[in-house]
Amino acid sequence: DYGGKVSGTTSSSGFKGAQSNQLYASESLFEGKIRREKTYTEFTENAIAADMLPLELKACESVAVTYTISIADDEKTVAVAAAKAEKKIENVYADIPALKIATDGSINETALTYFLHNVLRQTEFCARAKNYAGELIGIRDIFQQLECALLWIPDYCRGKIIEALGFIGEDGRAPRQYTYPRSKDVPPKMDLRKFIDQGVWIISTVYTYLAVTGDFSILNETCGYYKLSDDTVAYSDKRDSVLEHLIRIADFLISNLDEETDCLHALYGDWNDALDGLGKTDDKGKDYGTGVSVMATMQLYKNCNELTEILTHEKEYADKIKTYKATAARIEKGLRKYAIDENKDGDKKILHGWGDKRAYKVGCYCDNDGKSRDSATSNAFWVL
């Protein structure tokens, strides 16, 4: 009978009952015990160390189970490491602001408060940890999480911003994902697919950090670069300030503005992975065509205004301020001319983008399959 904690080891298929089963349909969970225990697995299997805890929760109650995992050659070292980790765990979420949400009664206040508290908790967890099953860390994910968490853990986020900026290419291109290098002699692995929007999140996050904290000293912190080519990563000796990193990122993005529409080339894609392919072209000898991401274009417009404001606090950047103001005006003109779709009744909507040579549009009244679609993200960034 299942009356207490069950612990054991098995394989993924042993726990779920079949390799094709999803975790929520695991036979072990339904039976309350590990279905087929194993002390070793084949090379093609995933090893599982599983606990099952019997819990009974009343309304609005919750339980969090935290595991401390230590690896050492002797029990004494494990015990010391575990004690240190337990102490840290107690204080990890101490800075999360206390919330008490009041509503008009249409939404349960307790449920909404509980939900938002867990959103903050998850945000801080993601900002602090490498929250991936694999080794690659998404640079967009890092900066999105930091932009939120800096509201209550600004000092920690400051260090993480500086750290992550050290993985930027010398030309200002940000990788899609990166790993921490195993040693000084071995460069990190990176996902170098040219998603155009990586850098826009970085600039906005640093701007938010400055707006919230007023700590402009971060702009003078020094960090490095990597040499990025199509499929290789190499160390770079170049080092300069956080501010110079932001300028390089912006200049890389601006270099990818389309000459005809003044909007930002999508290249491999943008944040909306479902629309990867807007940058494709059939032209021989070209990796990408003139396809555009309207969402990323508006993010760059926002970046230009953010950098203009940042640079007014710095000396010797008058030319850059002029450049970013002119670029913002150029982008606005292009967006108003090309990014607004109108139907026969005079109704209008914001496009998500278009393909090479504007051969087709996405998020318009008549997409290439004849259907009308709306892009939530491009409309949201038009407002922002």
Set out the residue ranges of the language-model regions.
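Trp/Gly-enriched beta-strand surface patches
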Residues: D1-A59
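Short Pro-Gly-centered flexible turn/kink motifs
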Residues: P54-D73, L300-N303
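Low-complexity, Ser/Thr/Pro/Gly-enriched N-terminal "stalk/linker" regions
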Residues: E75, K84-E135, Y156-G159, E163, ...
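Extended, well-ordered alpha-helical scaffold segments
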Residues: A79-V92, I107, A111, F115, ...
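Glycine- and aromatic-rich loop/turn segments at beta-sheet edges
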Residues: L120-Y132, E170-V186, S217-N220, N256-G285, ...
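Solvent-exposed loop and edge beta-strand segments that line ligand/cofactor-binding
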Residues: R128-I142, D185-D197, T281-T297, A359-L384
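Aromatic-rich carbohydrate-recognition surfaces in CAZymes
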Residues: I142, A149-C263, S293-T297, Y301
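Catalytic cores of carbohydrate-active enzymes
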Residues: P175-R176, Q299-L384
